[in-house]
Amino acid sequence: MKTNVTLIGMPASGKSTLGQRLAEALDFEFVDVDRIIEAEEKRLLKEIIAQEGDDGFLEIENRINAALKMDGCVIAPGGSVIYGAEAMEHLRDISICLLYTSDAA
């Protein structure tokens, strides 16, 4: 049984806000993958993009999302996660993926 929920959506669509509420309702942990990327890379996302370029950032994002190991979590990856084939396959394997849309996006 899949024990995670992953929210897929556009940047700034409200995935983190919804994710925190959903995690609380399900008694799950909330995971913001952007924060994991920053912690692992020891740089802010904007610094990674400035130094590595868009393609370099996408490679890092794909690698980190494809390596996530967790149970009982609501996962909010960045909006560009959909460009990482390995990441998307892994997220489908470890979670129920939901497409979140919002008028705010």
Positions of predicted regions on the chain:
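Hydrophobic anchor at the beta1->P-loop junction of P-loop NTPases
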Residues: 7
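ATP-dependent small-molecule kinase phosphotransfer cores
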Residues: 33-92
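Walker A/P-loop
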Residues: 16
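Pre-Walker A (Motif I) flank of P-loop NTPase domains
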Residues: 2-4
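Conserved small/polar residues in nucleotide/adenosyl-binding loops
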Residues: 100-105
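ATP-binding Walker
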Residues: 13
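P-loop (Walker A) phosphate-binding loop of NTP-binding proteins
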Residues: 10
